[in-house]
Amino acid sequence: MARHRDSRSPSPTGSHHSSRRNRRDDNGRRDRDRRDDVRGQRRSRSPDRRERDRDMNRRRDRSVGRLNDDYHRSGRRERSRDRRSYADRERSPDRRRRRSRERDYRDRRDDSYDDRARRRREDSTDSWSRSRGDETRGQTPRSDAGAKVNDAPKVSTPAVQTEEQKKAERLAKLEAWKKKMAEDKERKEKELAAGGTRKLLDAIDQKANGSPSLTSPNSPTTPATPATPGDLAPPTNYAGKFDPKAIAKKAVASSSSAHTLGKDLPLKELSKASATLTSTVKGLQADKKPTAFSSTSKVSALPKTRGNLSVFGLGAKVTDNEKTSQKRALDFDEDEGSRKKLEKLPSLPMANTEEDDAALANGVEEQDDDDDADLEAAGTEEEAAAAARAAAEKREERLQEAEAQPHTNGDVQMEDAPQPDSTAMDEDEEIDPLDAFMEEMGDPFSLPKNNATFIKDNIKSQPQEPEPLFGDDDVDLKALDADPDEILAIANKARKKKDIPTINYSALDLPPFRKNFYTEPTELAEMTEAEIADLRLELDGIKVAGKDVPKPVQKWSQCGLDVKSLDVITKLGYERPTSIQMQAIPAIMSGRDVIGVAKTGSGKTIAFLLPMFRHIRDQRPLKGSDGPIGLIMTPTRELATQIHKECKPFLKAMGLRAVCAYGGAIIKDQIADLKRGAEIIVCTPGRMIELLAANSGRVTNLQRVTYVVLDEADRMFDMGFEPQVMKVFNNIRPNRQTILFSATMPRIMDALAKKTLQSPVEIVVGGRSVVAPEITQIVEVREEKEKFHRLLELLGELYNTDEDARTLIFVDRQEKADDLLKDLMRKGYPCMSIHGGKDQVDRDSTIDDFKAGVVPIMIATSVAARGLDVKQLKLVVNFDAPNHLEDYVHRAGRTGRAGNTGTAVTFITEEQEQYSVGIAKALEQSGQEVPDRLNEMRKSYKDKVKSGAKKESSGFGGKGLERFDAEREATKARERKIHKIGGDDDEEEKEEKDDDVLLKAASVVQPAASTAPPKLLGVPKGIDLDGDIKVHRTEPAATTGSKLDKVTSAIDAINARLNKTGQLRSGVPIDNKGPDAGAFHATLEINDFPQKARWAVTNRTNVAKILEATGTSITTKGSFYPAGKEVQADPKLYILVEGDTEVVVTNAMRELMRLLKEGTMAAADAEGRAPVGGRYTVT
């Protein structure tokens, strides 16, 4: 068992225990002493003398840890005498607490001590005697037997020196070493000047690959250090860095002569050891007997047996002397190397041995100037590997030409060694992460360095230092620069808008499919036209349009459905079809395109699902990559989820599969479901396009789609989905069957239906946009502050009578929904909110909880107004009035479904009289009385429309997705400008295109009620922000009392009349008579720009910057007139720019126009992010 590193009892002076440097604090102290000492000073191998009381962690001699030590005790030792000699020593309290070493020695033990103890047993006593022979201390070392003392020669210096003497000696040796280094540097400079660049390279090759002889390769006349005892370095000189820990690690190699160098040491330290092999071996041999010196020159030579190679190209079988020298020399720099990972390993200077060893052991501080450059040249791992390969190729060429045996910084390089050996040091060197990071942070603006290309011209940047690797100040950067065209192509490809691959169905041989599955029953065929008309009138007044419309059925058995569908219908408890189902199912089963309009909750979903199941089961099963057969598109995610749930009972019975695909959910799950195969897909248009465009159209396709349904079709086109819906329709086979269903169908939809349907049958049940008669409608005109109190009254009345009832409250903005949620929660009503700004998972869970009765009240925007079917929903409150008739019908239609009754209460304020028209019309069509106050509001609004003060709008008609596309492109253009990299010519060429995109996107902020729509949307008419800037010269004022006074007054009168239009014309005099009036002026009208754009060119910060840069005078004049307001005598808001020269005025105008562009884009971006207001953003 190895003895612990902290021993309590003193070891005999001179024994190898006292010379062991096994204390970590000793290592640190030795490093500090070595840093302060001069080069070449003697080193002491024993710990410094110190007071025993200060050693708080000493262990007792009686510990069993010393049983395996090589501390050989004499059998005649009198232990009592030893105790008496130390009995009077003063002990610290801590020592009493820790008297036994066996309690905690394991947690403080270093496992390496076991190996060192084993190595010491294998080493001979003579080896230790030789190492200690030249010890500089005046001590009497104990022999291995413990009884004899080595007769070491007396040293010239006293054993104990004063601090002044030590300091003087260190300074003297430091000066000698500096003088020697200066002479050596001067000699190298002279040789460089005499030999030129070619000779310098040859010298590098000689130095990198030459034999480690004691003579300098560049100065053959300089005598080498003689191999005689008399001329050896005196014993008092410092013999290089000596680390007993490293010697103990290497001693184990002597147990087997067949061990290779790579197996004796960890791979991390082998690279360091190879670099210091030659110099440290010479330092050791200088202190040994003279017979060992002659072998030093052969240590780095090529081994005799070339075939047996170690990992560093060294012979695995060498002589004993060579092994001993290598083992002791390999890891002498262990401490310093572990502390400074990035320090450059020193090469062999062209000087005598003793001074070289001293400088190496003490860590030369005055290194060459290009050390930092070499460290920076490390680069990435790929660059370092490329550099090493290039260096290896050059070294191979030099090996073939060189006559002497090569060596490189102590590494033996063999001609037949594998090539990676030459890069072992670079690849195995571990770089400290902090040092590497600080190295990278040295110059953040420096250009990237390339280590893969070495050019001979680089020699000029480092002409004074013969190093194999040079600085990279002049390195060619072309190897790192990618082709700008390729980068632009990649960026364009990444930014390319995903599109659906177009399919030319005319060139495809598509298999035919069957549409008509309906056979008219006998009892219906026998009915006359009068009887059919009476039947339709009884069924909620069904109205049909089209040719050869089938007669309405009266029972499920007459619909032509298969047995499995009828069984599921029976289990679900559907006794008889509803009015829309009686007329729509026969028409769809006949293979006709159908437009169905029916009141909310009338069973429209089942009306198109049942024929779809029969349509799909008639076709062949899906194979391989076949896409779906039935496609159902909805405007909202909630409606898609609800339709998918209604499909599930039928899917299980018929063995079909359906996928619900909508935005906000994880697309990879939906792709996985589609790849497994699905006959039906229920989706929103946006997600459908994403799926079709994903993976270049290989995820799914529409080639097998023959049955298409658009549920709530009017709302889908109202929300702007028409481009997407038409894009999907264009990729479906033309002879498909198409079904359109909705509770409301404005007349504007007729033109769209004609484009997508072929000879459709139109079915209207109960009117086009009518609230169900089972719903009680209440409209109240109230102030905004009275709404919440009235809501609390309604909730209290409802839940006093029916605790299980549900309430749905509609608001117009997302922020309003959250605010109302907070207010109701404070009043004790459990509720939740749902709107488009919430995550899809939250929206789904909220609806599920509302249906299950977890929360009885839900606050929602119009996102929940379509298709939401909740049982026990007794009350619907329109807290904010709906903006058009169809929205009101769908909101009210959430209650009173499937024959149940319900109540819809609507709040409307005096300021919302434009909404009174649609609400009053809905009340009239459903047969309910219109309140007098509401009727007055409607009349007042119609009168204002007739007078032109107001403009009537139906609230229908989406803007399409071009608006969002333009905003998206404008945002990307702004980001490209902000993050543009300097020197990229392509970016400069694209600036004009980006500006066009900005202006195009700015079109969305143009007021809708503008009387004169501009040619370029977003920019007022007559203003070209990209055009030429017109600067006018200021005319001198007319002289008072001139004959032209009358003419001037007449001109003023004309100008006064012209100013009434609010337009700035070239003939209008500019009010620039103040002290800042300049010789030139220009005007820029900003009245019709968005608010953010106007603010950008009028706020103090921006104006001050322009004034400071151009020296002009900028004044805001005129008055702001909102859109539609009549312009008075004062002109519209404009900016007057005045300056002494035309150039400064032009520059100021250009900067103002730039600010206008940015402000316009900011307004467009803000509107695009939150089109309905609120603090939520859907990304």
Swiss-Prot record:
This is Pre-mRNA-processing ATP-dependent RNA helicase prp5. Signal peptide: none annotated. It comes from the Eukaryota. One of its GO terms (cellular component) is nucleus. Belongs to the DEAD box helicase family. DDX46/PRP5 subfamily. ATP-dependent RNA helicase involved spliceosome assembly and in nuclear splicing. Catalyzes an ATP-dependent conformational change of U2 snRNP. Bridges U1 and U2 snRNPs and enables stable U2 snRNP association with intron RNA. The Q motif is unique to and characteristic of the DEAD box family of RNA helicases and controls ATP binding and hydrolysis. PROSITE patterns: DEAD_ATP_HELICASE, HELICASE_ATP_BIND_1, HELICASE_CTER, Q_MOTIF. Gene3D superfamilies: P-loop containing nucleotide triphosphate hydrolases (3.40.50.300). Residues 365-384, 984-994 have a biased composition (Acidic residues). Residues 1-167, 180-241, 250-269, 318-427, 941-994 are annotated as: Disordered. ATP binds at residues 598-605. Residues 209-236 have a biased composition (Low complexity). It catalyses: ATP + H2O = ADP + phosphate + H(+). A motif (DEAD box) lies at residues 711-714. GO terms for molecular function: ATP binding; ATP hydrolysis activity; nucleic acid binding; RNA helicase activity. A motif (Q motif) lies at residues 554-582. It holds the Pfam family Helicase_C. Residues 585-763 form the Helicase ATP-binding domain. Keywords: ATP-binding, Helicase, Hydrolase, mRNA processing, mRNA splicing, Nucleotide-binding, Nucleus. Its EC number is 3.6.4.13. InterPro entries: DEAD/DEAH_box_helicase_dom (IPR011545), Helicase_ATP-bd (IPR014001), Helicase_C-like (IPR001650), P-loop_NTPase (IPR027417), PRP5/DDX46/KHDC4_KH (IPR056149), RNA-helicase_DEAD-box_CS (IPR000629), RNA_helicase_DEAD_Q_motif (IPR014014). It is found in: Nucleus. Residues 774-938 form the Helicase C-terminal domain.
